[in-house]
Amino acid sequence: MNKFRMLPPLLGLAFLLAGCGDSRPAETVRLVTYNAGTFNKYIADDYPLVAEMMREVGADAVCLNELDSCTTRTGGVFQLERIARAMGGWDYRFGRAMPYRGGSYGVGVMTRERILDHFTVALPRGEGAEPRVLTVVELARYVIATTHLDHTSAAAQRDQVAVINRVMRERYAEASKPVFLGGDLNALPDS
């Protein structure tokens, strides 16, 4: 778990620094994680607003959490597809955590680059908690994974992180490109 101790502050810092202009070297990748809260939670039709925020920070890829896919709650909208369209037709992959109201609920990744491969892994579930997943996409220059860890149990979080570490080591320990993890880790500074 020590590997993940600094992840939330570093992701926050990366997001803050993202607004410091776009004079970055060509090999730089700007990653953003965003808990969408099924969009429309606070503002009706906030897809254009979120897309504009992502453009302003110069995102190359975005990890999204709390997404509905074709549920009755959100009028049958495939939210990841809709926000990817709002970004100008970005590529995307959805990771289904559970069936929900006629559709699915889960996490996703969208990117301006073409996705070459992807997979989703179910994570251990805390007692009485929602199902959780890890969704991984591979691009030509890097690999990015997203998850939404349990918020009800530190033990469940540890079990979920253990699976994430195992899966990522098995698949990418010898990778010649960088591997990133983003998402809602539900972590506090002292966790």
Identify the meaning behind each predicted range.
Residues S69-R82:
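Membrane-embedded segments
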Residues C63-D68:
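A short beta-strand-loop structural module common to alpha/beta enzyme folds
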Residues M1-P9:
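Bacterial N-terminal signal peptides that target proteins for export
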Residues P8-A18:
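Bacterial N-terminal signal peptides
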Residues C20-A61, R73, R85, D91-F94, ...:
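Active-site regions of metal-assisted phosphoester/phosphodiester hydrolases
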